[in-house]
Amino acid sequence: MAQKDIGNKVPLHTLKKVEEVAAYYDEWALNNKYDKDMEAWNYTGPKETSETFNKYQKSKNIEIFDAGCGTGLVAVELKKMGYQNFYGADISQKLLDLAPQGLYKSLERIDLNKKLIYEDDKFDSVFCVGTFTFGHVKPDALDEFIRITKNNGLICFTINVGVYKDYGFDKKINNLIDDDKWKKLEFFKSNYLSSKDVNAWLGIYKVAK
């Protein structure tokens, strides 16, 4: 989640394999340390992204895919606003095990860099907060998010500024606009982990199929 390293044993940006990332987060989940750290570090990504999404989303009765959901921080914020139907996925089973019971309709251990198990147009909206960062999910995942999102649905995400250009997110986002796959509603820089001086680009895009 950090620009380079958030202080754990191994800098996240050095991890190359999916299973290494999964093991990193599994260890971080022990004794609920992940959630404790997020609270201590004033991690505002889930709240800010949810609030920005809520400005554009009218109906509360929608199905939301929470990609890289971790312990459920995004769904917790959305539930406060009246949303109820969440489907979560993450690479770390230990983080999934910490999600509040009953918060999600389903939870799946999934590598978001691969083709997703869901059918086309399955969800009304997709969230991916804190997952586009060093050693994690790559830009091509956006193609899958569009595939599983209904027309006019919203895709909401954060991208660590340290990987935005290096990983090619800038080109991917603009190519999807040029190809009429989605339209930009919001895109701005968020200081979403202020205590660690970590910034991210926060985007809200409407699917146009």
Residue ranges and their predicted role:
Residues 2-56:
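Conserved class I S-adenosyl-L-methionine
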